[in-house]
């Protein structure tokens, strides 16, 4: 059995590791266009305890990963210079490069072949195999090569965002809302190592154009964002790594496989960064695809059917929540008219899945503050 995987990110690496361990005689070859130490975006974030499933399926990777995570038990919203803490809404984070390097080492030890610096110009270059896995991210070459057959759908969100790093470390994952004469901004920021943080700046299109960010250089944009978030960066600069302004692409494929070609991770569907589930879903895809082959052996067609049957309901549920979250940010100027606690409450309800009852169980201190401020507002209006 010959397996070709395009893309050496979390999805491709973990699937390669699992399938090679399960079937050592199978040849598993990864094609990656970048060098092994390339990474973009600085850190990745997971909801707290979201990776417990790894302990069962790839215990050595789990053992390497968990002690290196930066973790915190709450989230913080900063609006109008007022902090609102949301207890119980914890997250963990790690640097993207560190995460990939762990997986690269495990893959090499298992006998997976990884070919770096390999730019693929035609799908024919990698199609001579029993199974071709497209794990090459949101701009997947494999998906685009078979776009009509995968029945790909694409929606570009209107907000702009740029992904930075900074040596300013933060206590927890935070959303910081700022305004200036040009409009409204929000930063998603969290530490992903003891000395580094990820800092994603987002704004609506009107603000982006009014600020002249559509015409600025990368350095000019970085300097502008440093000024907007100066109170939060405390003198530390933002660090660029291809930190250009982008629009988030909501990608979905109606078909998950075409003949012996399957997509996993962001190549299959993109998940907005505001819910912190993209890498977790990539891992879960890899595990589910490996399990499908455990059930079917080398029957590729049947394995792909089993994979889709197991994963599609789960993915569709999470994707609905992620899309609802992304649309919440698309109304950023409107949301910033809310008072700080009102904004935090509205944020927690943005996916449509969170009830007040569940929120009281998850975040009792936060909801006590919500109730107190509501009562004070009612007294003031009476």
What is each PLM-predicted segment?
Residues 1-3:
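Extreme N-terminal starter segment of soluble prokaryotic enzymes
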Residues 5-21, 133-134, 244-328:
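Conserved mid-domain beta->alpha element of the FAD-binding
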Residues 11, 15, 36, 139:
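Conserved Rossmann-like nucleotide-cofactor binding loop
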Residues 18-41:
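Glycine-rich FAD pyrophosphate-binding loop
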Residues 21, 291-382:
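C-terminal helical "tail/cap" subdomain of flavin- and related membrane-associated enzymes
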Residues 35-53:
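Conserved N-terminal glycine-rich FAD pyrophosphate-binding loop of Rossmann-like flavoproteins
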Residues 48-163, 365-381:
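Conserved N-terminal helical subregion
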Residues 89, 95, 171-250:
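Conserved FAD/dinucleotide-binding core of flavoprotein oxidoreductases
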């Amino acid at each position: 059995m010959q397996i070709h995987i395009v893309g050496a990110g979390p999805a491709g690496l973990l699937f390669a590791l699992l399938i090679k361990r399960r079937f050592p005689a199978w040849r598993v070859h990864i094609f990656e266009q970048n060098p092994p130490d390339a990474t973009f975006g600085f850190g990745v974030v997971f909801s707290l305890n979201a990776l417990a499933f790894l302990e069962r399926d790839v215990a050595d990777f789990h053992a390497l990963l968990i002690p290196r995570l930066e973790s915190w038990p709450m989230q913080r919203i900063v609006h109008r210079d007022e902090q609102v803490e949301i207890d119980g809404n914890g997250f963990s984070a790690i640097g993207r490069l560190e995460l990939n390097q762990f997986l690269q080492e495990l893959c090499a030890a298992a006998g997976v072949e990884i070919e770096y610096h390999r730019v693929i110009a035609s799908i024919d270059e990698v199609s001579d195999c029993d199974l071709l896995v497209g794990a090459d991210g949101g701009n997947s070459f494999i998906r685009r090569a078979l776009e009509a057959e995968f029945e790909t759908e694409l929606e570009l969100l209107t907000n702009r965002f740029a992904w930075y790093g900074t040596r300013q470390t933060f206590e927890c994952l935070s959303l910081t809302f700022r305004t200036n004469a040009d409009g409204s901004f929000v930063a998603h920021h969290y530490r992903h190592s003891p000395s580094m943080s990820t800092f994603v700046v987002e704004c609506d299109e009107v603000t982006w154009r009014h600020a002249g960010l559509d015409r600025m250089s990368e350095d000019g944009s970085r300097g502008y964002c440093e000024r907007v978030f100066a109170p939060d960066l405390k003198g530390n600069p933002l660090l660029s790594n291809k930190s250009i302004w982008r629009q988030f692409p909501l990608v979905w494929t109606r078909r998950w496989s075409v003949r012996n070609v399957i997509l996993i991770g962001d190549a299959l569907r993109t998940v907005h960064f505001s819910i912190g589930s993209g890498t977790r879903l990539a891992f879960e895809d890899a595990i589910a695809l490996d399990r499908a082959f455990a059930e079917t052996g080398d029957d590729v067609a049947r394995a792909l059917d089993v994979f889709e049957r197991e994963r599609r309901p789960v993915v569709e549920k999470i994707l609905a929540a992620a899309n609802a979250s992304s649309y919440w940010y698309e109304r950023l100027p409107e949301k910033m008219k809310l008072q700080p606690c009102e904004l935090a409450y509205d944020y927690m309800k943005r996916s449509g899945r969170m009830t007040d009852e569940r929120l009281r169980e998850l975040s009792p201190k936060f909801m006590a503050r919500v109730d107190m401020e509501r009562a004070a507002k009612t007294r003031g209006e009476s």
